């Protein structure tokens, strides 16, 4: 039985067209930065923007919507949207910087997915417009390309709901998806303004404050400085950055409850509680067992756990870290922070669900026959299906991680550093052991691109896309 046919592809194409229009609008915005700083590369942004707007308009207008939007369509749209966004960003960098496609695609996929890995050894030599493009891509990608477009271009209804779920989001702040997305938007914008103001109060220049807020709140982590946040040598800047990383890694539902004054609900959120516990435990382990300085420890633990990838240490300093500290950070990068936030990786709720599932199974075996044991997390009932789904996803996650790690090791990179790099790419983190570079061979570079893409979409949608395309074309 075929589950996807040509009619489904028409529906996917129609909604993909809307996303392409949104991407075209986003990549045109750095033109204003280019004008302000007198850069003569306007056509590098304008032409790709018009390509995206034009192609999107054609698909949206002429593709018939032959069936109602279902989750499979949303997943396929999301997968293709991230690829298209990376492609359009690549065209800009190829034109503006005269670099090859693979490096341009890597940089843009890293930015859009909030991974934060960069092929540039000296970002300070890049045009201001390109730096802003990277920051803007991370800020948009932090929410999700599809989520952003739902809030602006797609009318409320079933289609919006299916597309919302396609980017691994399921929480609802408001009864309708449209109002949920708008609320998320306003929270995100409010925190963005707050971040810019706080950075400004530390004495940071406006351009730096804008870019650092966009990248750290979105848990993207790319910097406009070669030394990342370490460039500023300021405790105040470090504190603001840690605050933004934690805000970015916290569920938007918790932010909404905080804004509404529901402090009891905030304090009893299990993901927030687990975040505090993990930050405390991993920092203590890094300081007292790994022998790493306290500030360096807590900063990078928060950076890794929130999947931001911001750093206050140079790459050579990070490569020289004790193996124990690298293992601590790898663990953080695998776990991530809250579902329903801008963070990547497995996410705390899945880890808790699986651990609780194991505990409940042990207690079921030990309990008297006929006993009924309540299974709840944060007051919500947890089904066998949810436990299996969490376990299955974590299993898939480690299979992909092993694949990426194997590719890097085969190319001669240190096994521990390769695991660090693979976990960073797949968790959309951005901390690097220096493996990612302009001269990284094509095969490991493509493996990291695939890992970033799959990690951002949480694997299943990509499998749905591949299966769907195969079925549709087999059907003729």
Per-segment meaning from a language model:
Residues 1-476:
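Membrane-proximal intracellular helices of multi-pass ion channels
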